[in-house]
Amino acid sequence: MSNTEVEELQPAPDFTLPAIGSDDVVKDGQVQLSALRGHTTVLYFYPKDDTPGCTAEACSFRDADHEMQKRGVVVLGVSADDIASHQKFAEKYGLSFPLLADTDTTISQLYGVWKEKNYAGKTYMGVNRETFLIDKDGIVRKVWPKVKAAEHAQEVLETIESLGL
């Protein structure tokens, strides 16, 4: 599968992925995006469990979770890590929102976040830290292609408020 780009004001591509987390959202160990219609959804992609930037971002969403829930917003974190890794990550940091396992990167490619990266002089393919804000009708209302991990949840909340979602 090749990378596509999901843009604002387009329908969010549907998917089903294995997940851990809230029984309100995770059904039979999976999350199906289209089943969340009627809820504003924050779909955030991150490179790897329990790494500094990803931990800062996850903890920012954890800290904003009460405010998100008050607004009826569902937060979904997605990485290529497996369910066992997600379980350890969620337990270690007290994450209350679902973490989805895109182990074959199909959904990361579908959303255009599987990209060439450079680190320490090496080039490799990996998940880019990006977020998609999806409205109650399944339309992408905002895309964040660059994220400041520790401040991101607050930025998302402000956007939800400004868009009246």
What are these regions, as identified by a protein language model?
Residues M1-L165:
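Chalcogenol-based redox active-site neighborhoods
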